Amino acid sequence: MTSENVVEAWRESAQYWAKHSDTIRKMFMPLTRALVEHAGNHEGQAVLDIAEGAGEPSLTIADVVGPGGSVTCTDAVQEMVETARSEAQRRDITNVRFQQCTADSLPFPSDSFDVVVSRLGAMFFPDPVAAACEMLRVTKPNGCLALAVWHKSELNPFCHVVTGVIDRHINPGAADPDAPNAFRFAEPGKLAGVMTEAGASDVKEQVVKFNIEAPISALEFWSMRSQISDTLRDKLAKLSAGEQAQITSEVEQAVQEFFPANQMRFPAQMIIVTGKKP
């Protein structure tokens, strides 16, 4: 899959990521904090965020690095960049700049950033090794590259419970494990191997466990999930209104245990891989 294909797939999702940006920020804040910790973010740093989605972790890191530091917030989709820019303006965050670009062709000089991060973006890079090489190129010597990705589907009911319902109605077909998808790097060691191949040193891998939480109901969860995922939107579009209503009912029932007191709480596991630029 080319960069153009990936961009087109995400372009339609951008409006929904903007719509649900506050919920998404809350859902993944524990992962954002873990990424900040493993990346060694601190005051005064220059940080590059790749595939920022609707503005995170860029806007959180901006607070960590403070006025003496800076964050460059990038995404392959211009609409995502504009959502992040609007959120920064709303929150009066001034130490962030914004740039539309792809991970495998970064428009920055070599040795520009103390830290380069990507939260839940690396799985969708058309050429992960080329992207990792580019990210290392723009990192300063001895600087850190830190990438967060989903662990295995079966460890993440936020995903697999929904998939289980959908697959009862639509044949999922054969999946290419190396094609851009959420669980492309779910196997421990796979992303670390990419980073090593790209030339990183001191490559380390850590499993992060947390709860995906937000003050939303099961029905609101399904509304969000079915909108922000281009894969789900495409599958649901093939079904009749009656079939879609049946899936909604089945998803609500299937996720009930993860909504105590009508509040979302899914256990989750992610993988964070870090490496240094020699």
Language-model region placement:
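A short SAM/SAH-binding and catalytic strip from SAM-dependent methyltransferases
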Residues: 114-128, 151
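A short acidic, Gly/Pro-enriched loop at the edge of an enzyme's catalytic core
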Residues: 104-115
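Class I SAM-dependent methyltransferase SAM/SAH-binding core
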Residues: 46-106, 130
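Conserved catalytic/acceptor-binding region of the Class I
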Residues: 129-130, 136, 140, 144-216, ...
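A generic alpha-to-beta junction signature in SAM-dependent methyltransferases
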Residues: 39-41, 65, 139
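Conserved Class I S-adenosyl-L-methionine
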Residues: 3-6, 10, 20-21, 25-28, ...
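Conserved class I S-adenosyl-L-methionine
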Residues: 1-45, 56-60, 83, 90, ...
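Conserved hydrophobic residues forming the short capping helix/wall of the S-adenosyl-L-methionine
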Residues: 65, 87-88, 166, 195, ...
